[in-house]
Design a protein with these regions (language model features):
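Sec-dependent signal peptide recognition
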Residues: 1-7
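Bacterial signal peptide processing site
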Residues: 16-19
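Juxtamembrane extracytosolic/periplasmic "stalk" immediately C-terminal to the first targeting helix
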Residues: 25-34, 55
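Intrinsically disordered, glycine/charged-rich N-terminal periplasmic/extracytoplasmic linker segments
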Residues: 38-41, 45-111
Length: 111
């Protein structure tokens, strides 16, 4: 009975051990996830800053009124649109980093 228990433990330990290729794939995925998160965080930071500037310009536009207010509203709208583009670009770059890692892993498995 004890022999079967030891044998079962050894079999489960062997099943849990990762090959060097699997470890390398895990490291690639982890690195890609981290790069993607960094990219998204940087894009969010830049976009938040632009949205804050847009909000400030909207407030100034409301106070200024007239043509000056209209100019400020146009600038605010442009900054808001730019912030959306920056977020989208960050998301796309993050997706590309993850897809690149997946492609590298698949290529290494096919060798």
């Amino acid at each position: 009975m004890r022999y079967l228990l030891v044998l079962a433990m050894l079999a489960s330990m062997a099943a849990c051990q990762r090959t060097p290729e699997q470890q390398q794939a895990d490291a690639l995925r982890s690195d890609a996830r981290q790069r993607a998160a960094d990219t998204e965080n940087q894009a969010d930071f830049q976009a938040d800053r632009l949205q804050q500037q847009a909000s400030d310009l909207q407030n100034q536009a409301a106070q200024a009124g007239g043509m000056t207010g209209e100019r400020l509203r146009i600038r605010a709208k442009a900054l808001d649109q730019e912030s959306k583009v920056i977020r989208k670009q960050g998301d796309m770059q993050a997706d590309a980093a993850r897809e690149d890692a997946d492609a590298r892993i698949k290529a290494s498995k096919s060798r």
